[in-house]
């Protein structure tokens, strides 16, 4: 039994869009599984818990019962119909990975085990972070597919640091760690801008690896259709989205607000376009700091992003046959 891997999230509502709660991952039967992973690996003992650890529950609790009823049952112009398109699609919320604030490595081990069980059940994983260390155990779990996976990364920052303060698995290092995983093949990085933890050496390391880096200036110049064209066709893909990759006018609740990110129309086009190119095995949305939100605007766009991902996957025929 693996009930110890996850625990029920907060209350009112306690699951994303009031989808059924399923914390027994040994008996998982779902097309789409939502999983909260609250904690990355800290660089300092005082940095855990951080505000990002509140995001999984904040995203779940941002919608009222009325909002949920409309979102699940009414016509959605983003999708051209109801969220699940009237199809027999099973979405579950697996709760949050059980935390052990005294043993952060154990938290990562639990996150990886949970993700492996979700992937092994042929469920599409939607992980809610947490800071950007969270995808590291999830990407390790992609090993279960035994195929090369294209990693698609949206972020203001490159995330290629080997270590910070001696820690190799924190929020500045997920793409470096991914590049070391034999099952990660092509890496496409979108939206880089401003100043982050990367130095000249990390940028060169990414280039030497062969990462396709499309900074925000090139992205806006060439357009999202060309960005999508540069991503290899067919998949499979794993998508990791740092909220600061999206423009702070629509996602202000981040720790590193940097102007010039993806706007909503680009986000929607990107999500639908990637899903139509091939199978997206899973995605994560990380680095939301709820305490910095303005008028709930970040939560609104987070919910819209996730719903567009779900609705696009349904319409792409992911769960037929």
Give the location of each predicted region:
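Conserved alpha-helical scaffold segments that buttress catalytic/binding sites
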Residues: 2-321
């Amino acid at each position: 039994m693996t009930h110890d891997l996850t625990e029920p999230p907060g209350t009112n509502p306690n699951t994303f869009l009031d989808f059924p709660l399923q914390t027994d991952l040994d008996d998982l039967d779902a097309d789409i599984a939502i999983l909260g992973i609250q904690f990355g690996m800290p660089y300092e003992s005082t940095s855990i818990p951080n505000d990002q650890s509140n995001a999984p529950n904040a995203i779940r609790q941002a919608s009222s019962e009325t909002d949920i009823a409309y979102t699940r049952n009414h016509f959605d112009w983003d999708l051209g119909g109801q969220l699940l398109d009237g199809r027999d699609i099973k979405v579950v919320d697996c709760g949050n990975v059980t935390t052990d604030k005294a043993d952060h490595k154990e938290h990562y081990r639990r996150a990886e085990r949970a993700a492996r069980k979700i992937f092994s059940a042929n469920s599409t994983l939607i992980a809610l972070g947490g800071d950007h260390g969270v995808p590291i155990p999830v990407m390790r779990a992609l090993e279960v597919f035994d195929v090369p996976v294209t990693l698609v990364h949206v972020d203001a920052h490159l995330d290629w640091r080997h270590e910070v303060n001696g820690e190799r698995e924190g929020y500045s290092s997920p793409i470096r760690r991914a590049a070391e995983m034999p099952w990660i093949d092509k890496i496409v990085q979108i939206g880089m801008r401003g100043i982050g933890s990367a130095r000249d050496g990390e940028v060169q390391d990414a280039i030497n690896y062969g990462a396709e880096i499309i900074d925000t200036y090139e992205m806006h110049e060439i357009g999202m259709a060309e960005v999508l064209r540069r991503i290899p066709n067919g998949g499979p893909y794993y998508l990791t989205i740092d909220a600061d990759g999206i423009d702070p006018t629509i996602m202000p609740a981040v720790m590193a607000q940097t102007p010039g990110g993806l706007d909503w129309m680009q986000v929607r086009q990107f999500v639908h376009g990637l899903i139509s190119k091939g199978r997206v095995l899973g995605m994560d949305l990380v680095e939301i700091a709820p305490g910095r939100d303005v008028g709930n605007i970040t939560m609104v766009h987070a919910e819209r992003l996730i719903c567009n991902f779900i609705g696009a996957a349904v319409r792409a025929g992911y769960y037929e046959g």
